[in-house]
Amino acid sequence: MPQYRSRTSTAGRNMAGARALWRATGMTDADFGKPIIAIANSFTQFVPGHVHLQNMGQLVAREIEKAGGVAKEFNTIAIDDGIAMGHGGMLYSLPSRDLIADSVEYMVNAHCADALVCISNCDKITPGMLMAAMRLNIPVVFVSGGPMEAGKVQWGNEVRKLDLVDAMVEAANSAVSDADVDRVERSACPTCGSCSGMFTANSMNCLTEALGLSLPGNGSLVATHADRKELFLKAGRLIVELAKRHYEGEDYSILPRGIATKQAFENAMSLDVAMGGSTNTVLHLLAAASEAGVDFKMADIDRISRGVPCLSKVAPATQKYHMEDVHRAGGVIGILAELDRAGLIHRDVATVHSPSLGAAIEQWDVMRHGEGSEPHRLFRAAPGGVATTIAFSQSMRYPTLDDDRADGCIRDQAHAYSQDGGLAVLYGNIAERGCIVKTAGVDESILKFTGRARIFESQDAAVEGILADQIVAGDIVIIRYEGPKGGPGMQEMLYPTSYLKSKGLGKACALLTDGRFSGGTSGLSIGHASPEAAEGGAIGLAQEGDTVEIDIPNRRIHLAVSDEELAKRRAAMEAKGRDAWKPLGRERVVSPALRAYAAMTTSADTGAVRDVSQVERK
C-alpha cells in the first residue's frame, strides 16, 4: 500500500520541527494522518479570466475539510495574453507556462502534498498546471474559472455578438468611427472569465474534460453562473475521495498518468479537431504528453486531423456561436457524444469522476436524456447579460437546449462542416517537421493558395508593413525568428492577422510563421513552422519574392525553390558563423530570464518543451 506522501513531514519523532511549523499554519493533532491536499490557485487582478478566483481556493478548501482532508492553498502567476499582446510582454507568455509547471511541482514536492486541485483558466495556466500534474503523478482534479459571457452590442438592426478580437479589428479599420470603436471596446469583454470564443483558454479547459481530469461542464459553463459553484464544491469532495482510493485502496488507475494515457490524448486531440480549437492546444498537448511519458507526436495529430470531422465552429471561426452556445448544445460531452456515435473516440479510458469516458457520455449527453433531467438542467445554464467581475452572480437559464445536430452549434457526423477536422498539420520543405493551421477559420476559397513571400524578421516589422499598406492580395507574409528560441518565447501573431482583416485582406493573403497564433486568430494563418529559423529551419532561408504553395486538402506547404538553391542558401547562411540563423536588423532587448528559456527550449513540433541536455556538460 502506498504511504501518504505527507507522512514524510508529519510522522515520527524526528519530524517534530516540521510538525511545529504545520501547527503554526493551523493544523491540529486531529489533522496529522489526514491527506494533505494542495490547492494551486491562480487568482490575479491582472487577468479577467482570474479576477474572480480570489475566494475559489478557500471554497474548495472548506469542502476538502468536510470530506476529511487538510487543504493548503498557494498561488501561481498568470499572464493575460491579450494585454501582453503586440509588445514585448508577449515574449513572456509561453515561458510562463514552464514557470507555472515548475512552481506547482516545487510547492507540492517541497511540502510533500498528497493530492492536488488545480484552479486554472487562461492560456498558459491550464497547460502549465497540466504539465505539473503529469510530472507529479498524484491524484488531481482540474476546475477552471469558466468562460466569459459573449459581448453584445446593437449594430444597426441587429444585436451583434463580440469578443476582444472585434475590438482589435475595428480599432485598426480607419473606416470605423472613434465612437463605434469605443462602443465595441466597452462591450467586447463584459464579464469575468476566459475570453468568450474557442480561444486557447477555453480550448484547453475543454480538453481537460476530454482527458478525464475535470468534471462535465468545466469547459463551457460561464463564469458568472451560480451552477459553476457546484463544480468547485464537487472538486473538493472528489479529490479527497481520489486520495483515499489511491493511498488506502492502492488504486493507481486514478492517477494522472493512469487517466491521461495515449488513448486519452487521442480523445483530447479528436475533440480539438472536431471543435476547431486553438492551434496552441497542439503545442500544449504535446508538452503535457511529454511530461506524462506518453508517445504522442505530430504524426498522431496529423493522423487524427485527417479522420475526425469538424462538428462545431465557434468564434473566431464565426461570430454566431461562443462558448455559452456550446454549453447550450451540450458542452464538451455533447461533442464527444457525437464523436462516440461516429466511432471516433476511445470509450474505455478512465476519468476522475466516472468509471470511463463512455459511462460519462451515457450519463451527461443531453441527446440521451429528457426534459427535467440533470444533464438538461446543467446545460441550460445561460449568460446573465449583466457586466460583472463576480462569480456565481446570476442563475439565468435557457428556455430550451440547442439539440439541432443538423444546423446547430454542435453537429453530428452526417452534417459536419467538413469530414476532416478543424486543425491540420502541413509538411513541406519550408516546414520539414510540420506546421499547424486552424482550418475551421479558413475560407474554403483559399484552402489552396499560392503567393509571393514577403519576409519580416519580427512581428513588429510585419505589423508596420501591414499598416503601411505594403501587403497586397496574393502575398504570403512570412514572420520568422519568432519561435521558442528565436523570439525567444514564440509570440502570438494576433495583431498581424487582425490588421490583415481590417485591411480587407483576410481572404486574400496568407501568413506563415515559426511563432504561434492567438486562439482568436482566423484566416489562412499557419504557425509553429518547425524547425524554427533560429534552429536552422528552412523558413530562415526563404527570400523576398519567393513563391510559396499552400495545399491544405493535401496537407502540403512548399517553398518553390530547388533543392540545389536551398543548399546554396544554407551554405551561405552557415558561413556567417556566430551570426548565422539570426534576424537581420532586429533590435530587441532580451532579459537574462528569457535567454535562459531560449537556451533550453525546443521547437514547436515537440511542444516547445524544455531540453536541459542543451546546457548540460557533455
UniProtKB/Swiss-Prot annotation:
Q: In which pathway does it act?
A: Amino-acid biosynthesis; L-isoleucine biosynthesis; L-isoleucine from 2-oxobutanoate: step 3/4; Amino-acid biosynthesis; L-valine biosynthesis; L-valine from pyruvate: step 3/4
**Cofactor(s) demanded:** [2Fe-2S] cluster; Mg(2+)
Keyword match Kinase? no
Q: Which Pfam families match?
A: ILV_EDD_C (PF24877), ILVD_EDD_N (PF00920)
Q: Which Gene3D superfamilies match?
A: IlvD/EDD C-terminal domain-like
The entry's keywords: 2Fe-2S, Amino-acid biosynthesis, Branched-chain amino acid biosynthesis, Iron, Iron-sulfur, Lyase, Magnesium, Metal-binding
- List of residues binding Mg(2+): D81, D123, K124, E492
Q: State how the cofactor is bound.
A: Binds 1 [2Fe-2S] cluster per subunit. This cluster acts as a Lewis acid cofactor.
Query: Which transformation does this protein catalyse, written as a reaction?
Result: (2R)-2,3-dihydroxy-3-methylbutanoate = 3-methyl-2-oxobutanoate + H2O; (2R,3R)-2,3-dihydroxy-3-methylpentanoate = (S)-3-methyl-2-oxopentanoate + H2O
Which catalytic residues are annotated? Answer: S518
Q: Which InterPro entries match?
A: Dihydro-acid_dehy_C (IPR042096), DihydroxyA_deHydtase (IPR004404), DiOHA_6PGluconate_deHydtase_CS (IPR020558), ILV_EDD_C (IPR056740), ILV_EDD_N (IPR000581), IlvD/EDD_N (IPR037237)
Which cellular component, as a GO term, is one annotated location? cytosol
> What is the top-level taxon of the source organism?
Bacteria
One GO biological-process annotation of the entry reads:
L-valine biosynthetic process
Give the sites modified to N6-carboxylysine: K124
The EC number of this protein is: 4.2.1.9
Is Iron-sulfur there in the keyword field? yes
Binding positions for [2Fe-2S] cluster?
Answer: C122, C195
Q: How does it assemble?
A: Homodimer.
Q: Which HAMAP family match?
A: IlvD (MF_00012)
Entry-linked PANTHER family? D-XYLONATE DEHYDRATASE, D-XYLONATE DEHYDRATASE YAGF-RELATED
Q: Provide the function of this protein.
A: Functions in the biosynthesis of branched-chain amino acids. Catalyzes the dehydration of (2R,3R)-2,3-dihydroxy-3-methylpentanoate (2,3-dihydroxy-3-methylvalerate) into 2-oxo-3-methylpentanoate (2-oxo-3-methylvalerate) and of (2R)-2,3-dihydroxy-3-methylbutanoate (2,3-dihydroxyisovalerate) into 2-oxo-3-methylbutanoate (2-oxoisovalerate), the penultimate precursor to L-isoleucine and L-valine, respectively.
For this chain, the family text in UniProt reads:
Belongs to the IlvD/Edd family.
What is this protein identified as?
Dihydroxy-acid dehydratase
Gene that encodes it: ilvD
